[in-house]
């Protein structure tokens, strides 16, 4: 699988431990952003994935967070995090983008969709994308618009743009072809799940 790592340097005035942002594009089809390179207490650098609150709390009553997306295997996690740090450390040579490969050359993926049983909720289903069986993207959803249409929503985060708060997708298809394929796969599985639920209800009568 081919993938590209990009590094974006940022001002550290507001966050002294933040060193840079990173983005990874898989197979020229799907891009994940918002990855951060941070400095630890001992001065070491580490890579952190974007997180979201799960709604649960730990024993100290603190919110529990989970990664929006993450490497599925230890081997790919070690490789990806190491390559991101390497690109960052070599950026002074003018290189802030590197093309890499892992495993098989072909780009393959699959989706998993779980329908929401609360039919009154505007979020109709939750989906995850698994790329190359080594990278997982959570927080994809099927939502109902005000007009009553279902659509696929990508993970987003609240960011300040010119002094205004906006929600921006932090991962998304890069090409129209893959955008249409991915949305089609998710909606197809969503409809299949709905049909199975209808059949199960009819049999239970």
Give each language-model segment a name.
Residues 1-205:
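Single-stranded nucleic acid-binding surfaces, predominantly the OB-fold ssDNA-binding core
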